[in-house]
Structures are given as structure tokens and as C-alpha cells.
Amino acid sequence: KGDPEDDSCDHSDNDDTQDEEEFSNPEVYTEEEMEAVEGHIEQYFGKVENVFHELVSPDIHVDICIVPPTEERDYYTLVTMGMGAHRMNVPEELAEYKLERAELAIALPADWKLVQESMQDERWYWPIRLLKVLARLPIATDTSLGFAPTMDNKANFAENTKLCADIPTCPKSTEQGGEA
């Protein structure tokens, strides 16, 4: 796992022209909540090998946990840690399901480049940018990320992919409870 002081990813998604005041009080997990999220990630996705720590946090602090490929899962799993510090505005009819907190995950091929140098290249960085943008969407829109609303980027995420939209769903390859 990455060292908390090691800013493995110095790619910033934030506009440098924003006032410093906006960055002074991001919503963050308590230490206990962070341990619970990390425990959940490790139980359902695997051991966290590294963490890309966010350098500037305007509203929530979103780190990206990296779970490497294994024999059982021949792909990287990237999971946000921090999105759930903000309670989403969930529709009343769904309140009983306690969906106001969530994290996001994405699976990437086993040969995906996830070293610091490759993060300077949008061809490798775009999945991390996507996770960070989606993690902040409930704050920007004062709503929640529901199941299966397509979000169209209107352009390819990067020059090396034709992917241009995302559809949030529950993880399909985890054991029972992994979606909790």
C-alpha cells in the first residue's frame, strides 16, 4: 500500500484559479471510516497495493486505491476512497436502502500502466480522472449516482479509446455483500 505521505499521483483535476478558501475544508472520512472502507475493498476486491493520493481537495478528498491483478482476477481494480464522506441526496423512495454513501470502482486490463510517469499521459490517466469526476458529481448536482444512468462525455475519454460514456452498476464479480 502506498505511503500516506507519498503523493504518487501529482495529476490535479482542479482549477488552479479557485480561491484557496475553497480547499480549506473538504469532507473527509474519520480514521475509523477509512479503515472500514479499506477493509471492505480488501475483503471484496483484494489487497490494496498502492494508493494515488489526491494533492488538492476542493470538496471531498478522493484517493484512488489500486488492487493489482491476481490469478482469480486478471485485471487491476481501482476503487475510490473518499467519495462516501459526502452523503448523497438520495430520493426519498430509496432512503430505506441507505444509499447515501458510495465509492466507485473500475476494472482495467492487467497491462494498464499505473506508474507515476504514465499518469502524466492522458491515455493512461483517463480512468482515474473519470473516477474523480464521477466522485464529485453528487456534490455538484446535489443528487446521487443512481444505478445505470448513462453519463455521456460527448467525446472519447482519451485518444487511445473509443469509450465516451459510463454506466454506474453494482460490481458483478464480487461475492455477496461486495456492493454494500
Regions found by a protein language model. Name each.
Residues 1-180:
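Short linear motifs embedded in intrinsically disordered, proline/glycine-rich low-complexity segments
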